[in-house]
Amino acid sequence: MRFTVKQIVWLKVLLHLAGFLPLVWLFWAGHQGYFSADPAKDIQHFTGRMALKFLLATLLVSPLARYAKQPLLIRVRRLLGLWCFAWATLHLTSYTLLELGINNLALLGSEIITRPYLTLGMISWAILLALAVTSTQAMQRKLGRRWQLLHNFVYLVAILAPIHYLWSVKIVSPQPVVYALLAAGLLTWRYKKFRQWWRAIR
């Protein structure tokens, strides 16, 4: 049985809750003192993982819609992508304000240049920003064929973001490895699309 338009609307509501409620929990956990001795790191990793989860969910939509024969499922892809950008922005903001401090914002540029994992993270965020800004139907019409080429840069984010996570942790734990493997699996699943995009930008 295929999804109806009404069911997709309810699915969007659930996905919005999945994006918003963790933010509520984050504020509540901070207020209750549930974080470790280094709450700044906890918040950075939490927001980063949320961005990765929505990134992986975004990449999953197209192949899932195709193989499950659920064409209307494509309608949730933009929503997932915007939540990915929102959490990535919170991730960047938490690093800037909690790690560097509001009085040291000028250091952000040099930090990005001198720390490779931050370089990858910033490139990923910049791509997500471009995708979010151009995600509307009006921008899709305006950009024409270039729109799809631009939005296929999500594949690059799927490569860089897990590496950023792996490099950012001092001790390699299973969690960043799992995210990297999931991203690799999704890129493999979408190998033909990924190869077409790679050839187009070379």
Curated annotation (Swiss-Prot):
> Which UniProt keyword terms apply here?
Cell inner membrane, Cell membrane, Electron transport, Flavoprotein, FMN, Heme, Iron, Membrane, Metal-binding, Transmembrane, Transmembrane helix, Transport
Which cofactors are named for this entry?
Answer: FMN; heme b
Q: What are this entry's molecular-function GO terms? A: electron transfer activity; FMN binding; heme binding; metal ion binding; oxidoreductase activity, acting on diphenols and related substances as donors
Question: Where would you find the membrane-spanning parts of this chain?
Answer: 8-28, 82-102, 116-136, 149-169, 171-191
User: Briefly, what is this protein's role?
Assistant: Part of the MsrPQ system that repairs oxidized periplasmic proteins containing methionine sulfoxide residues (Met-O), using respiratory chain electrons. Thus protects these proteins from oxidative-stress damage caused by reactive species of oxygen and chlorine generated by the host defense mechanisms. MsrPQ is essential for the maintenance of envelope integrity under bleach stress, rescuing a wide series of structurally unrelated periplasmic proteins from methionine oxidation.
Q: Where is the signal peptide?
A: none
Q: Which PANTHER family match?
A: PROTEIN-METHIONINE-SULFOXIDE REDUCTASE HEME-BINDING SUBUNIT MSRQ
Family to which this protein belongs: Belongs to the MsrQ family.
A GO CC annotation recorded here is:
plasma membrane
Which taxonomic lineage is given here?
Bacteria, Pseudomonadati, Pseudomonadota, Gammaproteobacteria, Enterobacterales
One GO term under biological process is: protein repair
Q: What is this protein called?
A: Protein-methionine-sulfoxide reductase heme-binding subunit MsrQ
Q: Which organism is it from?
A: Klebsiella pneumoniae subsp. pneumoniae (strain ATCC 700721 / MGH 78578)
Q: How is this protein organized at the quaternary level?
A: Heterodimer of a catalytic subunit (MsrP) and a heme-binding subunit (MsrQ).
Q: How does it sit in the membrane?
A: Multi-pass membrane protein
The free-text cofactor remark is: Binds 1 FMN per subunit. Binds 1 heme b (iron(II)-protoporphyrin IX) group per subunit.
Principal localization reads: membrane
Q: Which Pfam families match?
A: Ferric_reduct (PF01794)
| Compartment(s) where it occurs, according to its Swiss-Prot or TrEMBL record | Cell inner membrane
